[in-house]
């Protein structure tokens, strides 16, 4: 597995990876895409999210139960970059 920035615990990373895979496997948009490709997408996606999280984001999440607004852009960019890298190639 790729190296992570380390802000998310191993348990959080594992949970995020499982959630990504579950969502990708069940999406009607992904019919015909192999699980191995979707797995690579999810590893890329979770890794990119973790690389872009800051200590401030984690603190905000712990205090508010949600991530700050900028997190939506992190999610969008991570998804787009990993889609282009792993699925659309």
Can you say where each PLM-predicted feature lies in the sequence?
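Boundary at the C-terminal end of the N-terminal hydrophobic targeting segment
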Residues: 3-5
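Short N-proximal segments of mature Sec-exported proteins
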Residues: 10-54
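Compact alpha-helical subdomains of small soluble proteins
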Residues: 36-89
């Amino acid at each position: 597995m790729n190296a992570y920035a380390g802000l998310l615990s191993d348990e959080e990373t594992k949970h995020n990876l499982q959630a990504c895979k579950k969502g990708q496997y069940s999406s009607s948009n992904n019919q015909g895409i192999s699980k191995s490709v979707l797995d690579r997408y999810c590893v890329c996606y979770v890794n990119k999210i973790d690389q872009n999280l800051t200590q401030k984001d984690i603190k905000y999440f712990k205090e508010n139960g949600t991530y700050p607004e900028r997190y939506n852009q992190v999610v969008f960019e991570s998804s787009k970059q990993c889609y282009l890298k792993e699925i659309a190639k």
